[in-house]
């Protein structure tokens, strides 16, 4: 399946949501990246960037201030590949902490026991990224398939929590999370 990325809007977080464009924002494979698993990152200067991609490739694009369109880069391209590691599979996420950009992603087989989250650090959101290692792996006593995450920061503190999905050991369907 090709996949696709759309934009939905609502006046309230709980919805209801409606399709903002009437068509996908991205509906094609570019640089080998399947259009899935988008993550929007707002940098300190107010610029919004979207990271997305499956099938072992990750793209980055600039978004308009209203988040409804893609703004071409200075070279005229809409997408730049920023795949951080040969082990990248899907689920990109970025945060900025102490002036450094932390890029995280899922790797391994998403239906198997080796699905996990790895991370890299860079001085800019564009890279180059230096892989540091894995930040989340399965606990064979608890569950498998730990991956595809987000991170939240406790307001006013240098404290973060990772939120992810996994499968209990009793679950045998690799597509169940």
Predicted feature locations:
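Carbohydrate-active catalytic/glycan-binding domains of CAZyme proteins
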Residues: 1-177
């Amino acid at each position: 399946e090709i996949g696709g990325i759309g934009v939905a809007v609502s006046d309230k977080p709980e919805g209801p949501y409606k399709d903002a464009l009437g068509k996908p924002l991205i509906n094609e494979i570019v640089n080998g990246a399947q259009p899935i698993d988008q993550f929007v990152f707002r940098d300190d200067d107010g610029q919004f960037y979207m990271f997305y991609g499956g099938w072992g490739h990750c793209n980055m694009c600039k978004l308009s201030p209203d988040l409804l369109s893609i703004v071409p880069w200075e070279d005229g391209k809409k997408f730049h590949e920023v795949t951080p590691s040969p082990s990248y599979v899907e689920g990109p996420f970025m945060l900025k902490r102490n002036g450094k950009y932390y890029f995280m992603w899922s790797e391994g087989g998403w239906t198997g026991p080796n699905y996990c989250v790895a991370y890299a650090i860079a001085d800019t959101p564009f890279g180059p990224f230096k892989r540091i290692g894995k930040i989340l792996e399965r606990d064979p006593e608890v569950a498998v398939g730990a991956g595809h995450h987000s991170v939240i920061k406790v307001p006013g503190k240098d404290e973060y929590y990772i939120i992810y999905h996994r499968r209990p050991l009793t679950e045998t369907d690799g597509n169940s999370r």
